[in-house]
Amino acid sequence: MNKHWIRLGMVALLLGSMQISQPMQAQEVAREAKLHTYVMENPYDVPEIKAPKGKKVKNVVLMIGDGMSLMHVYSAWTANRGKLYLDNSQAVGLSKTYCADKLITDSGAGGTAIATGQKTKYHYVGVDPQGNELPSLITLSKQKGMSAGIAVTCRLWDATPADFCCHNVDRDDEYDLVADYVECGADYVVGGGAEKFENRPDGRNIFQELEAKGYQVARSWE
C-alpha cells in the first residue's frame, strides 16, 4: 500500500476552500503543506486481543489523553493504516464534555467529571458547582480497601491530576492544590512540579508532611 495516502494535514481543507480562480495561491498552500505533513513510514501491527471468558477484572488503569478529541484519535487511526489498540476495547462510548456553566470545558471541570462522575463549573477542581468537595475515584477506591495511585507526565498541580486528589474553586490556586496531596490518601503519586512542594510562601514543606504520613519521597528515578 502506498504510504503517501496517509499524509496528514490541512491540504484538502485549505484547497477545497479556495476558489478555482486562485490557482497560484492553491499551489502555494500545497507547497507549504509539505512542511506541516506527517508520514508514518512504519505502521505498527495491532493484534486482536479478547478478554478471557469467566474471569473478573482485577485492576483498572484509567488513561487520559489530555485534550485528546475524536480528531486526534482519527488522525492516529489513519496514520497507522486504520488500526489502533483502541480497536480492542470491549466497550466504546462518547461523552458530552460541556461543563456546568460553559459549552467548552477545561481540564479542571472536564477532569472533575471523569474523576467524580459529576459536572462542575469551569476552572473548578474536585468540587461541585457550589464548591463542595466531591469524592474521587481515588477516595472511593481507598474506601473499598483497594490501592490507588496517580502517574502523570505533567506537574501535579495541573488540573487533570489534581482533579483526583485536590479540591478548589480555582485551578490556578497552585499552592493550595499541592497542599491537598497531604490528605489525598493515594498510595502512589508520580509527577512533576517539586518547586510548589517546598520553599512555599506559607512556609510549609509538603514533602516533609508527606514523609510524616509514611510516604517515601523520591526526587529522581534512581
Please tell me what each predicted stretch does.
Residues 1-10:
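Bacterial N-terminal signal peptides that target proteins for export
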Residues 6, 22-25:
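Intrinsically disordered, low-complexity segments enriched in glycine/proline and serine/threonine
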Residues 9-12, 56:
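Residue-level detector of transmembrane insertion/anchoring sites
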Residues 13-16, 60:
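Generic secretory/membrane-interface signal
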Residues 15-23:
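C-terminal segment of classical bacterial N-terminal signal peptides
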Residues 25-200, 204-221:
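N-terminal catalytic scaffold of extracellular/periplasmic and nuclease hydrolases
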